Amino acid sequence: MTIIGQVEGHYILPAENKTTKYEHIIPALIAIEQDRSIEGLMILLNTVGGDVEAGLAIAEMIAGMQTPTVSLVLGGGHSIGVPLAVSAKRSFIVPSATMTIHPVRTNGLVVGVPQTFAYFNQIQNRIIEFITRCSHIQTERLLSFMHRTDALATDIGSILTGEEAVAEGLIDQLGSLQDAISCLYELIEAAPLRYTDASVPSSTLGKDGCSGTNGKIKTKEKSHPQE
């Protein structure tokens, strides 16, 4: 599955924009989760971000899947693409890719009252909670990247390279397509059969992730249902 361009929300973007539509992705994820012939899912990301509600909805869907999932950031996983990247059971990023972390913002006319900014802060807290729940980065560290003023010329935030994203615990592993595919096969082999009796034991490897992770193991027992 590919998540590319801009994540489209409740408004249709101009025809010249490459978009990922949540009304297409969400039903596809449900079908994948229910199809017993599908053993695993790889998510390829090259996105500039987009609508917060739509992106977070897709990320929560992926995080709540029992199907083994692996994400691979190619090119960029910016803005709301960060939660999408970390939502899989195992996340990879290629060395040349980058990830942009910045505060929540909006375009157009807004009401200049404290309640508006409190609402933006509430949305931002939801995103931060999801990222820290599904990765190893600490909340304080994530906020420090989000509020940097010396990294972007006309904006607030940070751009992390692939190596930096892994070093900070945002992404699990630096790797290529082959690395991501190999990891997905490992997760598939280690995973218990889906839709079976709950007494079937779960493999240790399936819980801990893939081998060759230099100690950066993410345990994700998913029970949870424009930046």
Question: Predicted segments — roles?
Answer:
Residues 1-82, 87-102, 106-227:
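N-terminal organellar transit peptides
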